């Protein structure tokens, strides 16, 4: 009887398992239907280097061009004369600001343009107490929501805040305040060595008027000033990990002099900075340990230790999401011979700038391979592109970039020009889908992701987006199949876990009732059998 009972239980379990398999079949048919009729290429502008993204194995997968180079402008074409050295570019409220400097006063400029790169204002200096003061070495630039223009000057080691008076060519800059270099009188953590090293380079200003400066030759972190322009410390300095032995020695053995010699921070050099719409700071690092970065590429998992870009909160903690197929470090192929065909591009991407876009996206500029990488909020690479090669007028030494709506602007120090890229229909569809997802409009996002697949049937993030939509709708069967198509293990595990819960919930009561029925039937049969035996014995 026990053997019969065990067989019945196993039979019921097998039926449940087969139910899971049967449930997956309609989902596979839905996924196949969504790819049916999709094309792998569309009629878009071509470039010398194919645009691409990465799959879960770290392979480059070509995708439609997300941006097209539509204009390239230098100082002469702009009507401001030859720009000897372009430095930085920043977009705000439909206007583009560019800084340039050189060996003479006329080379030092702050240029304002409209979105189409038409000249609006050409400033060669500012007004202080009614007197004109020429720029010396303008470098980084930032514009606040109120229209205040902040500029760093590497010759005076200062940050200047300007108010704009007038409009167009007649507009002039009036100095509102000057934030000088930190001094030994400002804080005990500032010494003469720091004062000599400090050269302000790039900056951002938050909504409370706190100023964050990336300074050349400063490896203590990002230099911060309060709303009054007073030195306020360092943000996001490198963390020191003290081993247990050193902790013991510091607590019980070391003298005060020996304790002071223990490093309090790991030297870290930032080279650029930007502010997102939520007020968080994005910063790029001038260098990182190549061995660590390579290890993270192989592991396909990024950490703060191998980061080339960070998202910092006001405490200096890195909160950047790195959930993509590869870490957000630019090119994952250390020697990208397939894309570049040039051994001079060997090595890690050299990230020189970061620009925050809409809906949590951000773009990184690599001046090693001259590529631009655009990521979403979770750290997935949306696409990488470069446009024409150098021989066709493309960028040779890109140094800065910024975004304004559907446009990306990049500065090239070699040609002393600004490059203007416009989104293609493919990128517009991707960004629209991301926007709808951020707004919680999953059904509408699903329609747009299907449109993305019409441009590129191999675009994994479209399947991921469709899978998320199905997941949030509770359609775990379809979601698991879509996540399987894009090889996303994390989301596939989530969907499969929910699917298993759903199936078990549906079959739980039938299983329990079946087992109880078997037990009751067994008990009844046993009673009947015993009664029959007693009757036979009485007879």
What positions do the PLM features span?
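Sec-dependent signal peptide cleavage junction
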Residues: 18-34
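Surface-exposed loop and turn segments in beta-propeller and other repeat-based domains
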Residues: 39-80, 121-133, 172-195, 230-265, ...
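Beta-strand-rich domains and repeat architectures in extracellular enzymes and scaffolds
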Residues: 74-108, 285
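Signature of short aromatic-glycine-proline-rich micro-motifs recurring in repeat-based ectodomains
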Residues: 77-88, 134-141, 191-206, 248-278, ...
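Conserved beta-propeller blade signature
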Residues: 95-98, 148-151, 210-213, 280-283, ...
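Short, conserved, GDST-rich strand-edge loop motifs in beta-rich repeat architectures
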Residues: 223, 283-308, 359
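Blade-level signature of beta-propeller repeat domains, shared across WD40, Kelch, NHL, RCC1
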Residues: 393-434, 477, 490
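TPR alpha-solenoid repeat register
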Residues: 462, 495-496
